[in-house]
């Protein structure tokens, strides 16, 4: 997950 980039997809 990287909130800085704007993508938070952890599975």
Curated annotation (Swiss-Prot):
Tissue note: Expressed by the venom gland.
S-S pairs: 1-8
Keywords for this protein: Amidation, Calcium channel impairing toxin, Disulfide bond, Ion channel impairing toxin, Knottin, Neurotoxin, Secreted, Toxin, Voltage-gated calcium channel impairing toxin
Statement: the UniProt record of this protein carries the keyword Disulfide bond: yes
Lineage: superkingdom: Eukaryota
GO MF entries: calcium channel regulator activity; toxin activity
Main location as per UniProt: secreted
GO annotations of cellular component type: extracellular region
UniProt-annotated location(s): Secreted
Keyword Transport: no
Protein's job: Inhibits high-voltage activated calcium channels. Shifts the voltage-dependence for activation towards hyperpolarized membrane potentials for L- (Cav1), P/Q- (Cav2.1/CACNA1A) and R-type (Cav2.3/CACNA1E) calcium currents. In vivo, causes immediate agitation and clockwise gyration, followed by the gradual development of general flaccid paralysis when injected intracerebroventricular into mice at dose levels of 5 ug per mouse.
The family this protein is said to belong to: Belongs to the neurotoxin 02 (plectoxin) family.
Comment on protein domains: The presence of a 'disulfide through disulfide knot' structurally defines this protein as a knottin.
Protein name: Omega-ctenitoxin-Pb1a
């Amino acid at each position: 997950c990287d909130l800085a980039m704007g993508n938070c997809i952890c599975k």
